[in-house]
Amino acid sequence: MDRRRLPPDLPALLRQREAERAAAAKPRFIPKKERERMAAEKAAKEEEERKRREEALIAQRHSSANGTNGSNGYSSGKSTTNSIPTGPKAMRHPGDSGEPEHGGKRRRLNDNDEKRAEMERKDAAELRAKYMGPEVNQSTFSAKKKRKRTAANKFNFDWDPEDDTSRPFDPVYAERPESLVRLAGYENTDELVLRKAEAIRRGDPETGEERARKLLEQHERVKQAAERKNFGKHWSEKKLEDMKERDWRIFKENFGIATKGGAIPNPMRSWAESNLPRRLLEIVENVGYDEPTPIQRAAIPIAQQARDLIGVAVTGSGKTAAFLLPLLVYISELPPLTEFNKNDGPYALILAPTRELVQQIETEARKFAGPLGFTVVSIVGGHSLEEQAFALRNGAEIIVATPGRLVDCLERRLLVFSQCCYIIMDEADRMIDQGFEEPLTKILDALPVANEKPDTEDAENSQLMSRYLGGKDRYRQTMMYTATMPPLVEKIAKKYLRRPAIVTIGNAGEAVDTVEQRVEFVSGEDKRKRRLQEILNSGQFKPPVIVFVNIKRNCEMVAKDIKSWGYSTVTLHGSKTQEQREASLASVRNGQANILVATDLAGRGIDVADVSLVVNFNMPSSIEAYTHRIGRTGRAGKSGVAITFLGNEDSDVMYDLKQIISKSSISKVPEELRRHEAAQSKPTRGGGKKLDDSGGFAGKGGSWQ
């Protein structure tokens, strides 16, 4: 039985064709040897085809030449076409043969075949490069192009490589040239110019004489111009009358002095140029003040012109002498105290926030006021009112007081201000921080108003403000010294000061550059005690040393531990009586005690000489308190170190702490503080609660509370 042939499966056939098409379109990798073999076979075939075409062409030409006889030019055989008669062979032109077009067509066909073959070879090469990449060992370097390019841009020197092209010795250029322009602080000597002129004469025999003469003439003109303008000398080498505006600007920049206000005099360069009385200058020399500090250079000339003044300076900058010396000049021109006017009150009043600072100012003032015959009395808490009333029985030209106790004396009629005409507020920002704004306002309101300055431009006129009122009184002069300028301090200054001159030394609120600030992250009281013991036992720091804590209870506990380590220690905090405070400071100053453990009570204004180290056992809650704590060291131009223990509870002040350390040229921000999350941006909420030294256990006291 015959089987019938089944029809092809159409879907299968379509799938087969699709697979073949996909396989054909898919690039196939061919090994290099196979490619070389295929190329050789293709080249051989092409060569064989070319030879075959050439042989066929030659045979065709021979056959066409043998188709005519040699006698009459007629064909011996029959021809399928009629031949055209021709002349002799020598007279024929190319193409005049009986078959003129056949040879040309063959040549054109041959040329077309060659072009087609060349195009096919190029297409094949492009396909190979597209799917298999370029030949690995094929070089694209063209020696012909390279030779053309280098030959076209080649530069030929006028000498051979063996020639000596070094320049001969020239005495003019044998020495380093010096500028003939005379700059500030530098002076060109005549010897240098003469030596240069002589070198020009020796090096240039033809025109050297003329050039040297012009050089000397130019130098002489420059020297004469410099002498006329006095431009070439440093400000320290000039006389006072030769100082120009540019010199004063350089002077202020050198000492970091910035002033604001109208009709401000120039700073003083030395004590001799201060216009202070000779007797007072002798006292300054005896006390040991060799050179004035920046705040003294700027503030004393302003104060001598009877101007109100706001002095903003870092701690330890010599502010006390800056306001004491003009004060003594002022009251020395007033009538002396007698039996008739001694009960009218003092001539000058100095206010300070703490008892210790008051006593320090009193001690400093007596150095200058005692030889001049002036009396200085301090009024502070801790002493009975009877003692202070007894001290005032003979009157006093200068009173130094804390605001609280002075208000008590005013309310009990122990003191009046009928002739007070010179007011100084030292550490004004600290007085505001401690809540003395109301007592301070009461004191300033109790001053006489008859000699108050007008709030006009006349307050900037030194001649008008230096006049006497009614033959004996003078206009009241008010000064305020502070390390920072919070809004409440600005409010008081605006109310009680008249057109004040503002003197800023450095940047307000920054630590002095003589203090190296170190920060260590130490959490927990026990770890901090061990670290403090390591620091004290290292032997790197000589006494005295001050350790600051935040609360009074910590003060006693830390002092007890330090004593157990073998160090003589005293404490200073708000619960101490005045006698105990004075005894503690005296023992540290005379060397009986090596270490002082204190709260922020000793953070401002307390001057203990040669403090080598300050340790912040607890970081204060404000950066201002930190600044004043570390300001106890590095005073009077000496260097010091401040070490601060930080914990996570101090996150509110980490940003400000990082900023103030980064501004110091001798301090380095530790990596842990720099990368701490709280130090990246200023906290939006308010800082930590301010510590009240009279309180019990407020603040960050740790586990000892």
From Swiss-Prot:
> Where does the chain bind ATP?
A313, V314, T315, G316, S317, G318, K319, T320
User: Which intervals of the chain are annotated as region Disordered?
Assistant: 19-148, 669-705
Q: Which GO terms describe its cellular component?
A: cytoplasm; U5 snRNP
Keyword line: ATP-binding, Cytoplasm, Helicase, Hydrolase, mRNA processing, mRNA splicing, Nucleotide-binding, Nucleus
What Gene Ontology molecular-function terms does this entry list? ATP binding; ATP hydrolysis activity; first spliceosomal transesterification activity; RNA binding; RNA helicase activity
Asked if the keyword Nucleus belongs to this entry, the reply reads yes
State its location(s): Cytoplasm; Nucleus
Q: Provide the Helicase ATP-binding domain boundaries.
A: 300-503
Q: What residue ranges are annotated as transmembrane?
A: none
What is catalysed by this protein?
A: ATP + H2O = ADP + phosphate + H(+)
Quaternary structure and partners: Component of the U5 snRNP complex.
What protein does this entry describe?
Pre-mRNA-splicing ATP-dependent RNA helicase PRP28
Say which species the protein is native to. Chaetomium globosum (strain ATCC 6205 / CBS 148.51 / DSM 1962 / NBRC 6347 / NRRL 1970)
Lineage, broadest ranks: Eukaryota, Fungi, Dikarya, Ascomycota, Pezizomycotina
Q: Which gene encodes it?
A: PRP28
